[in-house]
């Protein structure tokens, strides 16, 4: 059983706490994505969707939303709870082409990438790149590196750039920490926005 499967079984879901605490800020960032696009918005992939905290909102906003996670019971729960019409797939973010989910215009990663080792991060980056339509964007939340690696996973900006070499880093914005509590409020979380680099 994977680490995340155990955490879900034990009811340890700190990433959901962040989503609740930062809901307004997350909505504003997705608003920004949508202002730069014409309708229809296109397809969106929620990487490491868990119990579907964000996937339904993407669907309600007008995206054709798909959530992907490698914990089958959690994907089933997300699908059962969803009333938006979004789709859910059991799959591995480090082997996205194998999930056979098609291509996408927007990728959302809230805390998934940071839980992977360097090799897995590179694999996620390669998979996202393979599934990205021209002009696709990626919005990623990741905690910064800390001395508390055993308690709180985190990544550096260099790690993000290394995993997505064919993407332009458009912006890096500090994420709010209010309401998170220790140790997450010491982690310097950042929002990374990337855009697929046009072919030469």
Give, region by region, the residue ranges found by the protein language model:
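Class I (Rossmann-like) S-adenosyl-L-methionine-dependent methyltransferase catalytic domain
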Residues: 1-47, 51-100, 116-131, 136-200
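A conserved beta-strand element that flanks and buttresses the S-adenosyl-L-methionine
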Residues: 108
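Short catalytic micro-motifs in class I SAM-dependent methyltransferases
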Residues: 111, 115
């Amino acid at each position: 059983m994977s680490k995340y499967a155990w955490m879900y079984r034990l009811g340890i879901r700190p990433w959901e706490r962040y989503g609740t605490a930062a809901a307004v800020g997350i909505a504003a960032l997705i608003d920004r994505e949508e202002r730069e696009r014409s309708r229809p918005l296109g397809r969106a992939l929620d990487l490491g969707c868990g119990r579907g905290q964000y996937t339904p909102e993407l669907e309600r906003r007008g995206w054709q939303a798909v959530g992907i996670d490698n914990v089958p019971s959690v994907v089933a729960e997300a699908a059962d709870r969803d009333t938006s019409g979004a789709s859910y797939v059991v799959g591995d973010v480090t082997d996205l082409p194998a999930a056979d989910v098609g291509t996408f215009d927007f990728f959302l990663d809230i805390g998934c990438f940071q839980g992977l080792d360097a090799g897995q991060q590179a694999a996620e980056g390669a998979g996202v790149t393979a599934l990205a339509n021209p002009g696709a964007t990626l919005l990623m939340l990741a905690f910064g590196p800390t001395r508390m690696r055993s308690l709180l996973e985190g990544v550096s900006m260099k790690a993000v750039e290394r995993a997505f070499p064919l993407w332009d880093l458009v912006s890096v914005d500090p994420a709010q920490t209010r309401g998170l509590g220790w140790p997450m409020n010491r982690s310097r979380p950042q929002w990374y926005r990337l855009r697929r680099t046009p072919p030469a």
